[in-house]
Amino acid sequence: NEKSGSCPDMSMPIPPLGICKTLCNSDSGCPNVQKCCKNGCGFMTCTTPVP
């Protein structure tokens, strides 16, 4: 179940890099409105989406 919104563009990572380990497999594993997105390290973490 994908949540609404988009993952932030990681070519301009904010915050830089993020947590360098996988913390989720899908959006449904993330709390509230957060999505499972690839962070600047290339790992999947729960991230607040951009509209």
From Swiss-Prot:
GO terms for molecular function: peptidase inhibitor activity. GO terms for biological process: defense response to bacterium; venom-mediated disruption of cell wall in another organism. Its main location: secreted. Coiled coil: none annotated. Gene3D superfamilies: Elafin-like. It is found in: Secreted. Keywords: Antibiotic, Antimicrobial, Disulfide bond, Secreted. Disulfide bonds join C7-C37, C20-C41, C24-C36, C30-C46. Residues 1-50 form the WAP domain. GO terms for cellular component: extracellular region. Expressed by the venom gland. Belongs to the venom waprin family. Damages membranes of susceptible bacteria. Has no hemolytic activity. Not toxic to mice. Does not inhibit the proteinases elastase and cathepsin G. This is Nawaprin.
